[in-house]
UniProtKB/Swiss-Prot annotation:
HAMAP family the UniProt entry points to: Undec_diphosphatase
GO terms classed as biological process: cell wall organization; peptidoglycan biosynthetic process; regulation of cell shape; response to antibiotic
Localization, UniProt: Cell membrane
Note: Bacitracin is thought to be involved in the inhibition of peptidoglycan synthesis by sequestering undecaprenyl diphosphate, thereby reducing the pool of lipid carrier available.
This protein's record includes keyword ATP-binding: no
Membership in a protein family: Belongs to the UppP family.
Record-given protein name: Undecaprenyl-diphosphatase 2
Organism, as annotated: Frankia casuarinae (strain DSM 45818 / CECT 9043 / HFP020203 / CcI3)
Keyword annotations of the record: Antibiotic resistance, Cell membrane, Cell shape, Cell wall biogenesis/degradation, Hydrolase, Membrane, Peptidoglycan synthesis, Transmembrane, Transmembrane helix
This protein's GO CC annotations: plasma membrane
Length: 292
């Protein structure tokens, strides 16, 4: 990988990480279309350190409040009823499924899961699920905690059951094409949360798992047998941070007044286009895969 490829892939990562369209799928597809070698799961994980740093900065006040309340709850039992402390505990709970599955399925994540046929399928299927969840969330049910008519839930309503279900939804994102935010936002909408609450919790929930995965995969970058060098990876991570911060701000403003319909149409369209390229022979399912 050279610096130009690193810049392009960092831009793709930053622009798509927080949108429900799957950044890992876009990195895989972009490299295949450009005729570049698949950047691999390790490169994806490391560049996500940049986008998660954007989350840390964007939500710094929320995160500081949650961490402080959680820390106090370790020694003060009464603090465990505090909404921020409970959110901290539930983020930990929700991280367990993807952590366990990520270790168990590591070989599949770095191999078979990156097949472009599987990615095309998950783009379409999860797009339809997101569309169904968004329709369910907006079918005449008011948004807001204080509405007298079946109000949708906000983060203060988060329960142990919901936290675990959020975590299970996040685990699906181990397959490129699913989208971490797409899976968890869909899960949140189906559980009855507002669009804004589902998105904000999705971003918070991703942080421990994504940062841990990125740090773990640092060992795969820049070594003698590594496919990706340090220079392009660092550049890609920085570009992902800058564009990711802008994407968070835009996305949260967008969903406060609009539906996920454009993302649903985009996912389905991209999946169908990818299938047509595969069937027509313009791309092979393992395009860009390293030999061996």
């Amino acid at each position: 990988m050279n610096f130009f490829e690193g810049t392009v892939l960092g831009l793709v990562q930053g622009l798509t990480e927080f949108l429900p369209v799957s950044s890992s799928a876009h990195l895989r597809i972009a490299a295949a279309l450009a005729g570049w070698e698949d950047p691999g799961a390790a490169f994806t994980a490391v560049t996500q350190i940049g986008t998660e740093t954007a989350v840390l900065i964007y939500f710094r006040r929320d995160i500081a409040r949650i961490v402080a309340a959680w820390a106090r709850s370790l020694t003060r039992r009464e603090m465990r009823k505090d909404p921020d402390a409970r959110t901290g505990w539930l983020v930990i709970l929700g991280t367990l499924p993807i952590g366990l599955l990520g270790v168990t399925l590591q070989d599949a994540i770095e191999g078979p899961f990156r097949d472009l046929r599987l990615i095309a399928t998950t783009l379409i299927v999860l797009g339809l699920i997101l569309g169904g969840a968004d329709w369910y969330a907006s079918k005449g049910r008011p948004q807001g905690r204080h509405s007298p008519l079946r109000p949708r839930k906000v983060l203060e309503d988060l329960s142990v059951r919901d936290g675990l279900l959020y975590g299970l939804a996040q685990s699906a994102a181990l397959i490129p094409g699913v989208s971490r935010s797409g899976a968890t936002i869909s899960g949140g909408l189906l559980l009855g949360y507002t669009r804004e609450a589902a998105a904000r919790y999705s971003f918070l929930l991703a942080m421990p798992a994504v940062l841990a995965s990125g740090v773990f995969e640092l060992r795969s970058i820049g070594g003698k047998d590594a496919d990706v060098a340090w220079g392009p990876t660092i550049l890609a991570t920085f570009v992902a941070f800058v564009t990711g911060y802008a994407a968070i701000a835009w996305f949260l403003r967008y969903i406060s007044t609009r539906s996920f319909a454009p993302f649903v149409l985009y996912r389905v369209g991209l999946g169908l286009l990818l299938f047509s390229l595969l069937v027509g022979g313009a791309l092979s399912p393992d395009a860009g895969a390293p030999p061996g």
